[in-house]
């Protein structure tokens, strides 16, 4: 019986540690930004705040073609144009900072945005 209690205590400790790891572990999140929304040449949302290591998915929603170019940061830019509705690409931000981006074909129409990486 004593051996069973020792084994039970160990299981409880392991379970508690797993719970702590689950809730306090470093987790990267994915965020989606739509390119073109409700008939407008916009990024939706146009401003977001994420953590270092988070991935942003840019999805062509409507009114193609779109791309996403980050000023002074070609490593985060996606110059290829997305033509098909639903077409998407992912960008993972691995450095803290403020990043301004635009859709090159529609920047003059105000299709710009910003990502704050903490």
Language-model regions: role of each:
Residues 2-10, 15, 21-118:
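Extracytoplasmic copper-binding redox domains, predominantly the cupredoxin/blue-copper superfamily
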